[in-house]
A protein has these predicted regions:
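Nucleotide and nucleotide-moiety/phosphate-recognizing core
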Residues: 2-71, 79-101
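YjeF_N-associated NAD(P)HX repair module
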Residues: 64-154
Length: 154
């Protein structure tokens, strides 16, 4: 979805700043049109690698300084699909500073209800406005510090 598109934009910006970014499409490579556009922009970026979900565990063992999670966004509700839950479990055990985009995957942005495998962020960037879940006890536990970013939406 567009949360993944946001992650792709961040990967591009990081690569432009000479960071190496590894991108994993957890739920497959069927992307929204906007996310697909951002994926195509990365095709010629030397600083971005696309890795398969089955490669992630090994890569995490080598260590990352920063983990940015953008699997699901504000549209999530219910239980996490097993592929996403498995990745969240790996990420939650990994080293590195963890950032969630808008809302951690597994956290319902309206109710604050959290899947047992919800991504645990050190920092969450809320786009445009805080969501109700950011103010709940579960939201505070899974979001870490939450910072609202003005993205030009009024």
């Amino acid at each position: 979805g567009n949360n993944g598109g946001d992650g792709l934009v961040i990967a591009r910006v990081l690569s432009e700043k000479d960071w190496q970014a590894d991108v994993v499409f957890v739920l497959g490579e069927k992307l929204s049109p906007l996310a697909q556009l951002n994926r195509e922009r990365l095709n010629h970026s030397d600083g971005v690698s696309f890795i398969r979900p089955d490669e992630l565990e090994g890569r995490l063992k080598t260590g990352y300084d920063l983990v940015i999670e953008g699997i699901f966004g504000t549209g999530f509700s219910g239980a996490l699909p097993e592929k996403a839950a498995a990745v969240c479990r790996l990420l939650n055990q990994a080293d590195g500073f963890k950032i969630a985009l808008d809302i951690p995957t597994g956290l319902n942005c309206d109710t604050g209800e959290a899947d047992k495998d919800t991504f645990r962020a050190d920092l969450t960037y809320a786009f445009a406005a805080y969501k109700p879940a950011h103010m709940t006890d579960a939201g505070k536990a899974y979001c870490g510090e939450t910072v609202c970013l003005d993205i030009g939406i009024e």
